[in-house]
């Protein structure tokens, strides 16, 4: 009984398979019989859709043939092998960069230290350096440091320049080889070429704004008495410097 049922089922199945094989038509484009049924268009049993494996194109029974290029009806999404290879290399590189497989580790201690001790901005440091340089140039326009020894040399040279005009004027005040008057002994120089103490004391009392030429006064003759003779005029109270004017 069971065997008879099996034979009946197989007998029923085979005609259906043969019917499907007979229903599948050949390709209207290339005439190949290597075709297969795909689906019903718009779920309508009157519009079965087939696919030809020879020309790799679709068609619908009872419909018009469209000018579909060869292979245009294939629904397989083909991806180029080069892109897949590039994706594989990219994934391998990413995995080698992160051996742990997770996000990169962050040193919390370093982050906290940077938060407590922030680094100064480079632009602020450069601005401070420029301000310091500007202040230095304002204080010292020549841009050179004043060495004490160099400044002393300048003072010595200025002192010599200050004395030389006085010496030249005194030499011009000579009286053609005549012996000096008693007051002119103050103008004598010592063996080292330095003025006597009395002249230097008088020189110190000269104002800063007075030039060396103005500091030396012209000889002034003081007449003690109109009745005195010529000897009193020469050797009396005559002096090349008017010391009373300084007082």
Curated annotation (Swiss-Prot):
Start and end residues, zinc fingers (Dof-type): 25-79
Q: Does the keyword Transcription regulation apply?
A: yes
Spell out the InterPro entries in the cross-references: Dof, Znf_Dof
Highest taxon of source: Eukaryota
What biological process terms from GO does the record include? regulation of DNA-templated transcription
Compositionally biased region (Polar residues): 82-94
Q: Mostly located where?
A: nucleus
Q: Which UniProt keywords apply?
A: DNA-binding, Metal-binding, Nucleus, Transcription, Transcription regulation, Zinc, Zinc-finger
One GO molecular-function entry: zinc ion binding
What's its job? Answer: Transcription factor that binds specifically to a 5'-AA[AG]G-3' consensus core sequence.
By what name is this protein known?
Answer: Dof zinc finger protein DOF3.5
Organism, scientific name: Arabidopsis thaliana (Mouse-ear cress)
UniProt gene name: DOF3.5
């Amino acid at each position: 009984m069971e065997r008879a049922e099996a034979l009946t089922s197989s007998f029923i199945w085979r005609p259906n398979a043969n019917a499907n094989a007979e229903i599948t038509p050949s390709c209207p484009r290339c005439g190949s019989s290597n075709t297969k049924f795909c689906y019903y268009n718009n779920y309508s049993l009157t519009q079965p859709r087939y696919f030809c494996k020879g020309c790799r194109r679709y068609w619908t029974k009872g419909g018009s043939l469209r000018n579909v290029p060869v292979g245009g009806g294939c629904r397989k999404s083909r991806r180029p092998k080069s892109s897949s290879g590039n994706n594989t290399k990219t994934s391998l590189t990413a995995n080698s960069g992160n051996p742990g497989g997770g996000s990169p580790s962050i040193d919390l201690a370093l982050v906290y230290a940077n938060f407590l001790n922030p680094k100064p901005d480079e632009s602020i440091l450069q601005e401070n350096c420029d301000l310091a340089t500007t202040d230095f140039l304002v204080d010292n326009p020549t841009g050179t440091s004043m060495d004490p020894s160099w400044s002393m040399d300048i003072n010595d040279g200025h002192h010599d320049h200050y004395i030389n005009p006085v010496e030249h004027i005194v030499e011009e005040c000579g009286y053609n080889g005549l012996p000096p008057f008693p007051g002119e002994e103050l103008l004598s120089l010592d063996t080292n070429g330095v003025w006597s103490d009395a002249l230097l004391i008088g020189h110190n009392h000269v104002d800063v704004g007075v030039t060396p030429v103005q500091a030396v006064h012209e000889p002034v003759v003081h007449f003690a008495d109109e009745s005195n003779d010529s000897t009193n005029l020469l050797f009396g109270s005559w002096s090349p410097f008017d010391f009373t004017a300084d007082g």
